[in-house]
Amino acid sequence: MTEYKKVIAQNKKALFNYFIAERLEAGIVLKGSEVRSLRQGKASIEESHAADTGHEVFLYNCHIAEYEKANRFNHATRRPRKLLLHTKEIKKIIGRIRIKGYTLVALSMYFNKKNKVKVELGIAKGKKLHDKRESIKEKDWKRDQSRLIRQK
């Protein structure tokens, strides 16, 4: 059974810049105008990351455009947004992030089958320059392979 996901935004740079050690799903606290803007697909999580503040985890630098029809009741576009996780998950995340070199990045934002906005997070470790070059070579080689197979 495939799970329904209507993807709002993806962070493709994160997959290039980081090794993803673990993926997890979190809910997010939003205002009404933010949800309406997300339904129009006006969001960007390219530079966003998550960090802990004691017993809570917040998503920083996530851009959700202002909703045109909300006029004076609009939201701040880059405000920190609280992520909804169980306390066991938060403790596990904090333990992994405290290890040197690991960070928590947003990989995608989507609506699930119950029309709730979810954020896919990844516990990630940064790639070095030579690792990035290696992944570029791999990607090019796979592209060339598929071209050769199509030509035959």
UniProtKB/Swiss-Prot annotation:
Entry keywords, A to Z: Cytoplasm, RNA-binding
Coarse class of the protein's main subcellular location: cytoplasm
One matching Pfam family: SmpB
Recorded GO CC terms: cytosol
Domain of life: Bacteria
A GO biological process held by the record: trans-translation
Subcellular location: Cytoplasm
UniProt-listed Gene3D superfamilies: 2.40.280.10
GO molecular function: RNA binding
Matching PANTHER family: SSRA-BINDING PROTEIN (PTHR30308:SF2), TMRNA-BINDING COMPONENT OF TRANS-TRANSLATION TAGGING COMPLEX (PTHR30308)
Job of this protein: Required for rescue of stalled ribosomes mediated by trans-translation. Binds to transfer-messenger RNA (tmRNA), required for stable association of tmRNA with ribosomes. tmRNA and SmpB together mimic tRNA shape, replacing the anticodon stem-loop with SmpB. tmRNA is encoded by the ssrA gene; the 2 termini fold to resemble tRNA(Ala) and it encodes a 'tag peptide', a short internal open reading frame. During trans-translation Ala-aminoacylated tmRNA acts like a tRNA, entering the A-site of stalled ribosomes, displacing the stalled mRNA.
NCBIfam families on file: PRK05422.1 (NF003843), smpB (TIGR00086)
Family stated for the protein in its record: Belongs to the SmpB family.
Name of the protein in question: SsrA-binding protein
Species of the source: Rickettsia africae (strain ESF-5)
Lineage: Bacteria, Pseudomonadati, Pseudomonadota, Alphaproteobacteria, Rickettsiales
